[in-house]
């Protein structure tokens, strides 16, 4: 468990009260773990799904970080261009198939995804759609419900 909040004591002439924040810290950890996992689940329908390996690798990388507040929206090496939704080409040849050692550049041509529901910047699209639901569910978990 992470220590988000430290416990503290209140001392008066007649009394001393120790306040433990363990339950609050536990609830915060639980809420963060839920949110990280839920974001990944909600993103999947909008992600490119040609063979499924891109999503599998992205899920595995996100799962390894679950509870940290870090989400992997698109695992490399293809994640960047898939997420941006633009064709990338070898600057010298103009071909999507790059020469060995060539650094691809982004074009203004949109990618065509095999998944009809896939969208560029799928995390942003997902956040816009689910943010209110996420906030409500996180709040419940923080409250211990």
Residue positions per predicted region:
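His/Glu-rich zincin catalytic helix
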Residues: 80-86
